[in-house]
Each structure stands twice: as structure tokens, then as C-alpha cells.
Curated annotation (Swiss-Prot):
Molecular functions per Gene Ontology: ATP binding; magnesium ion binding; methionine adenosyltransferase activity
Protein purpose: Catalyzes the formation of S-adenosylmethionine (AdoMet) from methionine and ATP. The overall synthetic reaction is composed of two sequential steps, AdoMet formation and the subsequent tripolyphosphate hydrolysis which occurs prior to release of AdoMet from the enzyme.
Higher taxonomy: Bacteria, Thermotogati, Thermotogota, Thermotogae, Thermotogales
Protein name, entry field: S-adenosylmethionine synthase
The keyword Magnesium is annotated on this UniProt entry: yes
Cofactor(s) required for function per UniProt: Mg(2+); K(+)
Record-linked InterPro entries: ADOMET_SYNTHASE_CS (IPR022631), S-AdoMet_synt_C (IPR022630), S-AdoMet_synt_central (IPR022629), S-AdoMet_synt_N (IPR022628), S-AdoMet_synthetase (IPR002133), S-AdoMet_synthetase_sfam (IPR022636)
GO biological process: one-carbon metabolic process; S-adenosylmethionine biosynthetic process
Gene name, Swiss-Prot/TrEMBL: metK
Binding site for L-methionine: 55, 98, 251, 282
Length: 395
């Protein structure tokens, strides 16, 4: 049966993404001075104000006000007429230390306390910072080994931001959203793009026709592949007819409100934990990254066309309480053998994940817009394919 599947993305100027970027900018500043910082920072942005709160244990000193203002201005909120700008907005901060009850379980995992863990350094003693389920996914339908709808949505959103910042289209403002609907055939392969939706904030003195003409030329045409387009492609631009008031002045933004945009666009389940503002002892972040790393290497090794992995943790324990895989019937060998190889080759303890992916670095602000997965940046170690040969050798 043919099916349609849709995913969305947002620009860096979307209020929720403004909040994510502020939280991760603060995290990076702390990790830069003290790589062992424990950070859980939440941000709220609304008309004329940014509020930062959370739990932090660190030896670093960072200027929260300065980081917040610089981040907002880098995004593009630099003019008071936008209703929100980095120079004039108020910044409130309420940050306190991490609960000692949580810290005792993170500092030394339950297995270490009971003598079951042979750790080579103190990092390997780390217990999970919370309970929860984390998912990783990969599919060979794109070169990034990501679902096509979310990759196209991210690329459209990034291109929209690029033409705004470059001045190519001078009437654009920072807030924006994209959405892509892809048609899949009976073999579950993408065959065409059915609908492209772009909503972008703009100056008041421009018409919908002018906006649509510019976005088709500078955003849609460069991003949507010709082989996936036909005469029935449905293009929607600012369907409400007007999008002048936007950003935090029109829609309050919160850290962690775009978890489906951050991951796989709804192609697989999500455990609910957000990423931004959290240091890597929080398995909400590090285990999601590691699960993507595992899934991508399995698919790249040719063991399956699609691969999902679920990993679940208990707070204070290092080893996961469960690991489950699903190849959706695309496995090239027995799934039990794939699972056995995954468990043999990949160490899912939080400390081991941090070491393997080198996560105690100030790399997180880059993740906070346009997707945590599918972008092969040097800092994104979870996108590396350095376990492919090991998987092939074992199987």
C-alpha cells in the first residue's frame, strides 16, 4: 500500500529553538571551563524577557546575561520592532545546585557500590542521571541514513535562514517553520514529494505572491530534488496570509518543546526526554546520541535497511535495564544475531558513552537547531561510521 508521511522542522528563530539555543549556549560555556559540569538548564522566552532556570554543579563562572543576549542577537532578533531583541529584553536567572540525592547516584553507579563494576576510571563509574527510554534509528532511504521527510524539512529550514541572513531575500524575519509530505510506494521507498509547506515571518510591506515567488526560487527549488517532483506537487506558503508578528513576542518559547524535530520527525517512537541544556551524564541526551550511533553503523554495515533500537535506564544504574531492536522485516541476517553483536560491540553505560563519543566538550549549541542527527559535522561524533567493519567482522 502506498502511504504519505509528513515531518516538520523549524528555523533557529522559532521561539522554542531560541530557548534550546540559549540553554545549550550556557551548557557549552560551562563545559568549556569545567568539562565535568553537571548542567540542567531550562529557558523560557516571551515578549521582552528571557528566563533561565535549572540545576547546575560546576567550577565554572559564566555570565548568563551576556550569553543570553549574544545568542538572541546571533539568531537575528536585533530590532525592537520584532517585539523581542537581545539588547533590550530583560534576562532573569534562577539557577541552583544539583540535588545531592541525584548526584550520589550519578557520581557512583549502583553496580559500583555493590562491587559489580570494574571501572578503569571514575568516568566509568557514572550512573544514569534519570530513568527513561531512548530510541535510535537509521534507514538507507537517504545518504545521511535518515528519513527523507525530516531531512528535507531541515534543509528547507536551514536554507530559509541562510537567505535571510545573507540578505538574498531582505523582507524575511527570523521565525519560520517547514513541513514536507513524502509519498512512499508499496516497497516503502520514497517516490515523490507530495506537499511542501513553509511559513515564514516577514516584513509588513510585502505580498504573499512576492514571498511565495522568492521561497520557490531560493528555498524550494534548490532543496527538493527534481526526481521527486511532479506536476502535482503542492506548495503552501504562509497559508494564513500574514506572518508579521512572530518569535517570542507572538509565541512563548520553552526548552525541549521540539523533540520530534530534534530527532526523526515522528518516524519512530520517542521516550519523551529533551536534549538541550543537559550535560551528557543525562542519558536523555547521551543515550539518544549513542542509540543513533549504533543504528547508523548497523544500517551502513548492510545488516538491515531500517534499524531502530530502544535502550532503557534506571536512575543511578550504569547498565541499561533493557535493549530492544527492530528491523521492520528488513534484516539481512537473523535479528537475534544482530542484537548479540550490538551488545558485544557497544558499551551502553553512560560513562562509556561519554568516552566513546567524546561528549565532555562544548559542542552542543550547534545541535540546537536543524536536527541533532543526520548532519555530519566534526563535532557530531555519533554520526561516525567507525564500527561498520567491526560489525561485518563479527557477523
Amino acid at each position: 500500500m502506498r502511504r504519505l508521511f509528513t515531518s516538520e522542522s523549524v528555523t533557529e528563530g522559532h521561539p522554542d529553538k531560541v530557548a534550546d539555543q540559549i540553554s545549550d549556549a550556557i551548557l557549552d560555556a560551562m563545559l568549556e571551563q569545567d568539562p565535568r559540569s553537571r548542567v540542567a538548564v531550562e529557558t523560557l522566552v516571551t515578549t521582552g524577557i528571557a528566563i533561565v532556570s535549572g540545576e547546575v554543579t560546576t567550577r565554572a563562572y559564566v555570565d548568563i546575561q551576556d550569553i543570553v543576549r549574544k545568542t538572541i542577537m546571533e539568531i537575528g532578533y536585533t530590532r525592537a520592532k520584532y517585539g523581542f531583541d537581545g539588547e533590550t529584553c530583560a534576562v532573569l536567572s534562577s539557577i541552583h545546585s544539583q540535588s545531592p540525592d541525584i548526584a550520589m547516584g550519578v557520581d557512583k553507579a549502583l553496580e559500583a557500590k555493590e562491587g559489580e563494576l570494574n571501572a578503569q576510571d571514575d568516568l566509568e563509574l557514572v550512573g544514569a542521571g534519570d530513568q527513561g527510554m531512548m530510541f535510535g534509528y537509521a534507514t538507507n532511504e537517504t545518504k545521511e541514513l535518515m528519513p527523507l521527510p525530516i531531512m528535507l524539512a531541515h534543509k528547507l529550514a536551514l536554507k530559509l535562514s541562510e537567505i535571510r541572513k545573507s540578505g538574498t531575500v531582505p523582507f524575511l524575519r527570523p521565525d519560520g517553520k517547514t513541513q514536507v509530505t513524502v509519498e512512499y510506494d508499496e516497497n516503502d521507498r520514497p517516490v515523490r514529494v507530495d506537499t511542501v509547506l513553509i511559513s515564514t515571518q516577514h516584513e509588513p510591506n510585502v505580498t504573499i505572491a512576492e514571498i511565495k515567488e522568492a521561497l520557490v526560487k531560493y528555498v524550494i527549488d534548490p532543496i527538493i530534488p527534481e526526481e521527486l517532483r511532479d506536476d502535482n506537487l503542492n506548495i503552501l506558503v504562509n497559508p494564513t496570509g500574514r506572518f508579521v508578528l512572530g518569535g517570542p513576542s507572538a509565541d512563548t518559547g520553552l526548552t525541549g518543546r521540539k523533540i520530534i524535530v530534534d530527532t526523526y520527525g515522528g518516524a519512530i517512537p520517542h521516550g519523551g526526554g529533551a536534549f538541550s541544556g543537559k550535560d551528557p551524564t543525562k542519558v536523555d541526551r547521551s543515550a539518544h546520541y549513542f542509540a543513533r550511533y549504533v543504528a547508523k553503523n548497523v544500517v551502513a554495515a548492510g545488516l538491515a535497511d531500517k534499524f531502530m533500537i530502544q535502550v532503557a535506564y534506571a536512575i543511578g544504574k550504569a547498565k541499561p535495564v533493557s535493549v530492544m531492536i527492530n528491523t521492520y522485516g528488513t534484516a539481512k541476517i537473523d535479528e537475534d544475531k544482530i542484537l548479540k553483536a550490538v551488545l558485544e560491540l557497544f558499551d551502553f553505560r553512560p560513562g562509556a558513552i561519554i568516552k566513546k563519543l567524546n561528549l565532555l566538550r562544548p559542542i552542543y549549541k550547534k545541535t540546537a537547531a536543524y536536527g541533532h542527527f543526520g548532519r555530519e559535522l566534526e563535532e557530531f561524533t555519533w554520526e561516525k561510521l567507525d564500527m561498520v567493519d567491526e560489525l561485518k567482522r563479527l557477523l
